[in-house]
Amino acid sequence: MIKIENLTKSYRTPTGRHYVFKNLNIIFPKGYNIALIGQNGAGKSTLLRIIGGIDRPDSGNIITEHKISWPVGLAGGFQGSLTGRENVKFVARLYAKRDELNERVDFVEEFSELGKYFDMPIKTYSSGMRSRLAFGLSMAFKFDYYLIDEITAVGDAKFKKKCSDIFDKIREKSHLIMVSHSERALKEYCDVAIYLNKEGQGKFYKNVTEAIADYKKDL
């Protein structure tokens, strides 16, 4: 279970403070792959970043005993002057045991299919290459929950198939919390849904299709 307790997140703007959400309370139940649904600006991606420890709330708490990934495929944290291999090694030292480090690096190298670019500076990469490296890095470590934000759109048809296959493998032992504009992806990968509604609160649905229907009514 992941419990979101009185979570508030805001940003300062020229016209005043903008609240992404205020005193948000949600329970992500244990044992499910969960679709996170909401209109643009509802705070779906922001919430994933907070749950994954990439962003900080103004106030409130994330309560869980589970090991949670950063948002899968997040490429913004790479150091551009370092090579792909060097970036991967840096992260692997934080998340892998010493005797597993080389195995994790080899996995990312094979999965990302970057060839010689794996040993070239990240600043020479295209956005697609960064995304493939970031996705492979996210998949190299074991988490109880993987946070997925539109990552199913990454790469060509072959790479998308590889992503789909590894999602299926992950779901055998772990779970997903997924944000996607693709109804097909949400229905395929998720069992239940949480809808961030117009009132700024999360409503739980046992059926993803019903959550999508209510979301469409509010458009």
UniProtKB/Swiss-Prot annotation:
Gene3D superfamilies: P-loop containing nucleotide triphosphate hydrolases. It is a peripheral membrane protein. Keywords: ATP-binding, Cell inner membrane, Cell membrane, Membrane, Nucleotide-binding, Transport. Pfam families: ABC_tran (PF00005). The keyword Cell inner membrane applies. Belongs to the ABC transporter superfamily. Putative ATP-binding protein, and an energy coupling component for the transport of polysialic acid across the cytoplasmic membrane. This is Polysialic acid transport ATP-binding protein KpsT.
